[in-house]
Amino acid sequence: MTDLAMTVVVAAPQKIMPSLSALAAYLDEVGTTIVSRDKCPVPTTLQHRRSCELWRISATKGELSRSRLAAIGNELKIDINLQSSEQRLRDYRLAVFDMDSTLIECEVIDLLAERAGVGERVATITERAMRGEIDFDQSFKERLGLLKGLSSDVLDELLNNLPFVEGGSELMLSLRSLGIKTVIVSGGFDVFASHVASVLGMDGYLANTLAIADGRLTGEAVMPIVNANTKREQLLTLAHELGVTAEQSIAVGDGANDLAMLGAAGLGVAFHAKPVVRAQADYQVSHTGLDSLLYFLGHRGELAQ
C-alpha cells in the first residue's frame, strides 16, 4: 500500500504543460484519489520555458511505481516524481552536488583531452566509468596520464567558457535564501570546482588536485582520489559538522560514482543521469533544469528571484 499522503511532482521544459491524461489514467488504474492539482511557482527567469504542477494524492489501493511514472514522463519529455509528505516537509540543511554534467554541461577531463589530441580515447573511458563499467580510480589515473605535457594555458580558456546547466543559478539563489549549505563534491578537478562554486555562490568544494609543473600537466594523480566512497563520506562529514542528520541532506549527480552519495542523502536526485543511476535513484530529473529540485521543497514558500 502506498503512503496515504503523497505528491506527484510534474515539471516540464516548456511554458505550457502538455496533456497529462496518461498520468491521470495510470493513477486511476492503481486506485488513486487525486485530492488536488495545483500549479507550482517557477523562477521568474525561467517562466517562458518552465511549468510545474503538484498533484496531491491519497487512498492508493495498489502500489505506485516510480519507474512507471518516470516512463510516462519520458514519453512526454517531462519529469514526473513521487514524493512522500515526510520527505516534502523535511528540514533540509545541506545540498551536495557533483560538478561535471551536473552543474556544468560537460566533462572537463574530456575537454582537456580534446586539447591534448586524445579526445576520443578519454571520452570513451569517461563514458564507461560513468556507466559503472570500469573502476573509477583506475580510469581516472589512465585518463589523467594521457594528459601529461598539456600546457596549463588551456585552463583559463576553458574556465572562461564553461557551459553552466540551466536553472543552476536560480537553484543556488533559492537554497541560499533558505539557509541550506551548498557544496560541490566532484571527481573532477579543483581549479574548475573552485570557479564553479564561486560563480554560483556556493559554500565550498572538494575535488581532485590537478598537478602542474613547469606550466604543464604532470599526468600524475594526487592521492587520495575523490571517488564514490569519498563522496558519500564527505556528505556524511558535512552533515555531522552542521549538526544535522544525513536525512536532512540533498545529493545530486549523474554518474555511477554518485550512487553511494545519492543513497546516503535524504533526497537523492539523479540529474540527466546514466541509466544505471536512474534505475537506482528514487528521484530523477531528465528533461528539465536544476531548478526542478526546488519543486521538491514544497513547504518553503516563495522561490527567491
What are these regions (language model features)?
Residues 1-97:
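Non-catalytic pre-domain segments flanking phosphatase-related domains
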Residues 20, 66, 109, 122, ...:
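A general structural signal for well-ordered alpha-helical segments in protein cores
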Residues 67, 149, 154-267, 271-305:
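C-terminal cap/substrate-recognition subdomain and adjoining C-terminal extension
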Residues 87, 94, 113-115, 203:
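Active-site phosphate-binding/coordination module
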Residues 92-108, 254-257, 262:
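Asp-based phosphoryl-transfer active-site loop
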Residues 99-100, 131, 214:
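Residue-level recognition of short loop/turn positions
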Residues 102-103, 134, 217:
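Hydrophobic "anchor" residues
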Residues 108-174:
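A metal-dependent, Asp-based hydrolase signature
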